[in-house]
């Protein structure tokens, strides 16, 4: 199994283990040293207990306190439910001050949401090795909703209809990726993951350079769009942001594959049930990233018309 680049899945519970590392597969040495006499003395009691166990309904992973795919799905749905509720709040807040005299939407909701979400994401990532706190993950979803609602309202104000386009595109990418993964046609590999990590580092460096250049006025207002190099330059008539955007969407889709793979590995490892929250958190991080990248790519395309 290839390791996920998503920090949510950095915990050992989501990493592949050898059979010797998996609990319950190798009996302790002390158990193998019981004498035959002791075994015979307890045989009747053990037999009676086994008869009762066989007669009772089998315990599922949830009954034994283990992480399951189904439980992870339910928690993912819950997180996105919280995100949608606060996204509505962010949208209303962004547009509340728009009037004929003041036609500019507020950027406060998505700035607050982005900063709050980033801080909570770091806290969840670095504290989950000791203890998983669902309340922090739910709070992260709430801040991400504020961010998504705010930035979506802002983009919709500038490019009407863009939110529906970005939402449908995001759902399509997630749906196709999930279907291909479930069918076994797409799987993570160590070689592909190495390429993915190199591409991610390159993209982060490019983004940092782009932001710095924008801060220092390298791209004056009205000289090609609000996204710096992404909207200022083009290759064969295609905006650089669209070319990079397509590559980033592919990267985000592969990141989803890594997320799904990590969740399956966590289930195989018998990770405790709270790790389902961490799996749901990891999926949300990737899907939000995917949506924002698609939103920006469509904005660059429409701004270039």
Please provide the spans of the model-predicted regions.
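A hydrophobic alpha-helical transmembrane-helix feature that marks the membrane cores
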Residues: 1-305
């Amino acid at each position: 199994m290839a390791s996920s680049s998503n920090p949510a899945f950095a915990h050992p519970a989501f990493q592949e283990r050898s059979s010797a590392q998996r609990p319950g597969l190798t009996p302790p040495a002390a158990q193998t040293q019981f004498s035959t006499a002791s075994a015979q003395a307890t045989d009747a009691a053990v037999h009676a207990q086994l008869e009762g166990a066989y007669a009772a309904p089998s315990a599922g992973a949830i009954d034994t306190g283990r992480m399951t795919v189904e439980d992870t799905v339910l928690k993912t749905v819950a997180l996105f439910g919280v995100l949608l509720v606060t996204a509505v709040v962010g949208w209303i807040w962004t547009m509340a001050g728009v009037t004929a005299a003041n036609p500019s939407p507020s950027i406060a909701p998505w700035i607050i949401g982005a900063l709050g979400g980033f801080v909570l994401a770091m806290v969840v990532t670095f504290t989950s090795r000791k203890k998983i706190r669902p309340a922090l993950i739910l709070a992260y979803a709430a801040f991400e909703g504020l961010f998504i609602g705010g930035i979506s309202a802002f983009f919709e104000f500038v490019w009407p209809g863009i939110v529906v386009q970005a939402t449908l595109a995001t759902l399509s990418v997630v749906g196709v990726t999930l279907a291909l993964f479930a069918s076994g046609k797409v799987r993570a590999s160590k070689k592909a993951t190495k390429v993915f990590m190199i591409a991610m580092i390159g993209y982060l460096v490019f983004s940092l350079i782009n932001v710095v250049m924008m801060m220092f006025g390298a791209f004056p207002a009205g000289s090609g769009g609000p996204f710096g190099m992404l909207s200022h330059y083009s290759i064969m008539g295609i905006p650089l942001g669209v070319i990079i955007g397509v590559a980033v969407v592919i990267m985000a889709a592969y990141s989803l594959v890594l997320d799904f793979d990590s969740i399956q590995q966590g289930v195989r490892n018998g990770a405790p049930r709270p790790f389902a929250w961490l799996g749901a958190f990891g999926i949300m991080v990737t899907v939000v990233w995917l949506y924002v990248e698609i939103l920006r790519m469509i904005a660059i395309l429409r701004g270039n018309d």
